[in-house]
Amino acid sequence: MMTQEVEGGKVKCQRYWPDTPRTAEMVDDRLQITLIKDQYLDNFVIRLIEVKDVQTNEIQRVTHLNYTGWPDHGTPSQPEQLLTFISYMRHVHRSGPIITHCSAGIGRSGTLICIDVVLGLISKDADFDISDVVRNMRLQRQGMVQTEDQYIFCYQVILYVLRCLQAEENISG
């Protein structure tokens, strides 16, 4: 989740998990959601949520990550915090899709997805073109990476990562 519930006095996202750990809420006549625990860090919140089908007793555990350091329509001031968030996101991901959302679902989410895709390409030592990544994303969902600042931020984050990798290479060298 790349938004806060309320930003600038406007509701950006309705809360879809219980407020209090160990509290269960029925979503409908079949699904029960329980916030198992939450942990507040500097720029994001980690929530462990349990979704139970009360008819079948099937339980799914969801790790919900809420990045809180990203202003609406802007960008984080530094790439490090977002990279920490992405690193943790990749660490907890076991299988299935990673689901991301912000308020409109294209600005911050699009920027996160673009950066994550390019980081994956870098880890495979593959060629990449950020503008092509964004173009392909926009073929699937119009408006991904919503503002010029977000587009520039994609380049800034990747440049930061490449410089760090180059510095590591020079040290071990």
Give the label of every model feature segment.
Residues 1-173:
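Cys-based phosphatases of the PTP/DUSP/CDC25 superfamily and their flanking regulatory architecture
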